[in-house]
């Protein structure tokens, strides 16, 4: 790591032009396989892949030469059964080089992020997903309309390569990136309009590289809001370019290349809104404003045109929905959120006269999406589409303790994430489904009945589904029922797969 940092510190003005030689340094591949950097991305053990033999610069050079020389219409890297390279499958070598290449292309953006954090101490980086909701709770109560946006991602990858040229001027690296994109078996999935096929594009083998490309695409999309904000508020910008799974609220850009400045001065007056707020998680974002419906409709029209002329991508206007906050709930992320109107009567007395005043208080409300959660449980075969619990036959061969641990972990994760809901009674149904599904799985394993399993396990069975916050809150607030409290945790950096249906 120190060697890599030293290389980058030698000549900062020219470092973007010499990324390609880094591909032949073995320290890059050791960095790529560092689990601390890759987070939840799973990789095969080093001993299974023969990492010491594979990551030599000679092997990498031979692989890249063959990539340039091969006939793309005859040979495919993804045919691991027929194509072998030095005793290993081509696919494993392709995976190894793509991992190293992903680290290399992140370097210019990571260096900007580090330099920005050193210069600006007021930049906030909230890692917890739950930190989004206190922000919404403080802001949305005073706003009127919300734009529910699905960010268009099925664009042609050549557009991403062209966009990267603004930041990376190393042409060999960009050419190599094109080879990676054409060689990948799911290359066409990214340019299709089928969302389910697009999700398969981020494969296990090349997840880091394509996650980088997707985040860069979203970064280009969000640059519009930064540009407009700078025009009105004249704030000094700082960098933003982290490609890990984090949540950034106050990310701004330094040295942003504005390609539309000459054409935007005539339309900026349409979007001057001091109360516009923007929040995004993954491919979904919301824009809330205190303005009128006409203003929000202008924003919608401009976003569609921006996607078309900036990314050469035709986006249907139906991907953006305008809704009034007081009459609409939006799904973001893992919650059904909206504004609840609480009417109240206030009595005011003045001398001998008294007045009754009707007051309405807006409160940001978060509800557990029971239907979505049941659909997620049905997908993993824990219940049917009606919510009726069924046994998990795949886990029937595991030990009793492993089965209890699996179901208990799912229950605790869902309860932990949805602890911010005002009413948690709907979670009781989800816990009931998980408990009964667990009991049926154990009964299937032992060829017994659910009643016999519950009688044999007793309190041990229920303890597996008791969450920590229930125990802690009962001690801190003994008079406050757990279902009426709302807690936001600052240690949640990702949504459980069942919660993010």
UniProtKB/Swiss-Prot annotation:
Any Pfam family matching the protein: MatK_N
The entry's keywords: Chloroplast, mRNA processing, Plastid, RNA-binding, tRNA processing
Record has tRNA processing as a keyword: yes
Principal subcellular localization: plastid
Keyword rRNA processing: no
GO cellular component, one term: chloroplast
Subcellular location per the Swiss-Prot or TrEMBL entry: Plastid, Chloroplast
Superkingdom, natural source: Eukaryota
PANTHER family: MATURASE K (PTHR34811:SF1)
Family, as annotated: Belongs to the intron maturase 2 family. MatK subfamily.
Protein purpose: Usually encoded in the trnK tRNA gene intron. Probably assists in splicing its own and other chloroplast group II introns.
Name listed for the protein in its UniProt record: Maturase K
């Amino acid at each position: 790591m120190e060697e890599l940092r030293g290389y980058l510190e030698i000549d900062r003005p020219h470092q973007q032009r010499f990324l390609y030689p880094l591909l032949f340094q073995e320290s890059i591949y050791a960095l790529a396989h560092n689990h601390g950097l890759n987070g939840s991305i799973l990789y095969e053990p080093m001993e299974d892949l023969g990492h010491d033999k594979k990551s030599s610069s000679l092997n990498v050079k031979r692989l890249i030469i063959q990539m340039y020389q091969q006939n793309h219409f005859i040979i495919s890297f993804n045919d691991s059964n027929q194509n072998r390279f030095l005793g290993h499958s081509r696919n494993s070598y392709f995976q190894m080089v793509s991992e190293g290449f992903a680290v290399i292309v992140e370097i210019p953006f990571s260096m900007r992020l580090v330099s920005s954090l050193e210069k600006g101490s007021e930049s906030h980086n909230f890692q917890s997903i739950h930190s989004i909701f206190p922000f919404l709770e403080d802001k949305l109560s005073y706003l009127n309309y919300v734009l529910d946006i699905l960010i268009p991602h099925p664009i042609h990858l050549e557009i991403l390569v062209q966009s990267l040229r603004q930041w990376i001027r190393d042409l060999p690296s960009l050419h190599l990136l094109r080879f990676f994109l054409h060689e990948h078996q799911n290359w066409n999935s990214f340019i299709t309009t089928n969302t389910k096929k697009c999700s398969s594009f981020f494969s296990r083998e090349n997840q880091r590289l394509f996650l980088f490309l997707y985040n860069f695409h979203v970064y280009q999309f969000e640059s519009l809001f930064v540009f407009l904000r700078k025009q009105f508020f004249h704030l000094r910008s700082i960098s933003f370019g982290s490609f890990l799974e984090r949540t950034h609220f106050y990310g701004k850009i330094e040295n942003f290349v504005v390609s539309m400045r000459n054409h935007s001065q005539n339309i900026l007056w349409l979007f001057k809104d001091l109360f516009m707020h923007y929040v995004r998680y993954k491919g979904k974002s919301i824009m809330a404003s205190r303005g009128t419906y006409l203003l929000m409709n202008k924003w919608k029209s401009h976003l569609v045109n921006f996607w078309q002329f900036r990314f050469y991508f035709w986006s249907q206007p139906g991907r953006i929905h305008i809704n009034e906050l007081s009459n609409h709930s939006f799904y973001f992320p893992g919650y059904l959120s909206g504004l609840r109107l609480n009417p109240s009567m206030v009595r005011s007395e003045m001398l001998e006269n008294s007045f009754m005043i009707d007051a309405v208080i807006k409160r940001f409300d978060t509800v557990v999406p029971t239907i979505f959660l049941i659909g997620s449980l049905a997908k993993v075969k824990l219940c049917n589409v009606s919510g009726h619990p069924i046994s998990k036959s795949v886990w029937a061969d595991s030990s009793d303790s492993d089965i209890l641990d699996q179901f208990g972990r799912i229950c605790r994760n869902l309860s932990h994430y949805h602890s911010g809901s005002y009413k948690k009674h709907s979670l009781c149904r989800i816990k009931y489904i998980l408990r009964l599904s667990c009991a049926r799985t154990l009964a299937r394993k032992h060829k017994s009945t659910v009643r016999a399993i519950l009688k044999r396990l007793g309190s041990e069975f229920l303890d597996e589904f008791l969450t920590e916050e229930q125990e802690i809150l009962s001690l801190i607030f003994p008079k406050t029922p757990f279902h009426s409290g709302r807690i936001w945790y600052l240690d949640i950096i990702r949504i459980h797969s069942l919660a993010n249906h």
